């Protein structure tokens, strides 16, 4: 393969979940005062719980999951940017995103809902224009409803409207001796 050619990457397995132990939702673990999402496996056994579990499966296997694969034009997953299935503080956790939207985004100079933000992830990070259907999932699609259900559940006990929750986003990096590229 020449430098101007590309080869499709082989699908990668979803990463195994990390067990953070028994921590009640909304309670701090340690001295950092970081929000804790509900423990894995504690979603209710009802239709909402089914949607939460589907949402988590889509989140960790976005490019290969039957409900979401047609919207993904590469081998990216939500978990590729939002580590530990969107649970990990300091790695763009989804519990912090849920309580911070709607929000103004400088990228498109308007107020975005959480649905529009997720659609943006499909469009830009997962290359939806190159996907089988050529666009991000519709707002009322099974894919987005399941993802929203999962993200909503992760934010159980989070203070709504807190756009500065500790652990939100990524940590600031110190400049290296060589600087940044």
What does each model-found stretch correspond to?
Residues 1-64, 103-181:
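Post-cleavage N-terminal segment of exported redox proteins
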Residues 55, 75-86, 147, 181:
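The canonical Cys-X-X-Cys-His
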Residues 61-76:
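Local sequence-structure signature of Cys/Sec-based thiol-disulfide redox active-site neighborhoods
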Residues 82-89, 126, 155:
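Short alpha-helix boundary/capping elements
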Residues 90-96:
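Short cysteine/histidine-rich zinc-coordinating motifs and their immediately flanking basic loops
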Residues 97-103:
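Catalytic and substrate-binding regions of cell-wall glycan-acting enzymes that process beta-1,4-linked
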